[in-house]
Amino acid sequence: MVVNIYDTANELSRQLRETQEYQGLQKAFEALKADGDTFDTFKKFQQAQADAQHKQMTGQQPTDDEIKNIQNLAKEVSGKKVVQDLMNQERQVDSMLQQLNKTITSPIQDLYSEVMPKMPGQE
């Protein structure tokens, strides 16, 4: 039997959209977009973070003003309920994805199980 793993991945992608976790995230994101001022600030925060990360990846350091701007934007958006709700939904999706990743990669973990270091208390 020939298995096309990419067909399976595409089906998993489709099913992901049907999960409670994804639908909750989608609803939270729509609520954020509906709050125009908060959404604009959120986009500025995301862009400022991306710019700083890009600088770091190219060997540059963000300026003190850029860091202060990111901190101020983070403080402003993190206090908003719609952003807190979005972050809670992101955590739920992340938890689900971690479990999926654990399941998907279990054959690799099994393959290397003989050489994986044991943590204290494991048998």
Swiss-Prot record:
- Signal sequence, renumbered to the chain: none
Q: SUPFAM superfamilies this protein is in?
A: YheA/YmcA-like
Pfam families hit by this protein:
Com_YlbF
Please list every transmembrane segment annotated in the UniProt record, as residue ranges. Answer: none
Tell me which family the UniProt entry assigns to this protein.
Answer: Belongs to the UPF0342 family.
Protein name per UniProt:
UPF0342 protein Lreu_1268
Species, as recorded: Limosilactobacillus reuteri (strain DSM 20016) (Lactobacillus reuteri)
